[in-house]
């Protein structure tokens, strides 16, 4: 149970997503830390509780009492909270945190990629511990901001990655670090994705205008992205292929297929990153395929490594 008595009320304009989430994120550092008694249970909330988020939410719920849940899709939200009849339901994470942030101890963020950072930022500035589904953020800048906030707030954070959570991957990384593969000089990783619509079949926004389904909070799905009319080509799931919402095959799968190599070879920052080949580029969706080369410098533990990524 949370020890703070602070309560904050916020009002939002329809399109003040970035200002509301980011500004509030950088304004709440005065909130006190939690103090737990021996018999107190964690107060749990979820943002994005359908699809993969349902697994994250259910796992988190095993460690405490669910008091709030948020999803832009009311149908998925209703399914996910059936086991938690006392949970307060929201379609807008800003409303959930502003109304219940002083009660929430820990939450998952498992939304579309482009709203990972705004939701996590706001929660972290309230002192809420967060589990954010991969990829961590939509941009590198956002990831750096989350790292800064985590240090300042001294809270627990984790990026969700199923493979990394398994003993097999961690043991494999230990094997590589112990020299089991000898001197690693090259790494090749790949994925058959995309398995969702994007280039070359989808390169423009749909011209058709659809009515927003009654169960969908379209404004909250759009979040910090530029507003556009609703179409079923965007959600659920299909947002992965759109620049405004997803991170393409690289963001969706590289967290999985490259992580063993990154952990085992202790890779950090590359010295060069080169897109050596790709399908045609357009302004709306990711290319149908790509090849990317990365160079990692030598360290006191190993020599330089050339990393090759293939998708499509």
Predicted regions, residues:
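Short, solvent-exposed loop/turn and secondary-structure capping segments
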Residues: 55-60, 79-82, 117-122, 142-143, ...
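Loop/turn elements at helix/coil->beta-strand transitions in domains of secreted/extracellular proteins
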Residues: 41-42, 64-66, 85-86, 102-106, ...
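N-terminal secretory signal peptides and thylakoid transit peptides that target proteins
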Residues: 3-24
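N-terminal Rossmann-like dinucleotide-binding module
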Residues: 20-84, 163-166, 176, 261
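Contiguous beta-strand/loop segments that form the cofactor/metal-binding neighborhood of enzyme cores
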Residues: 171, 183, 188-194, 198-312
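A contiguous active-site-proximal alpha/beta segment in oxidoreductase catalytic domains
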Residues: 129-131, 137-220
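Structural recognition of the beta-strand scaffold that forms the well-ordered cores
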Residues: 43-47, 67-71, 108-109, 131-132, ...
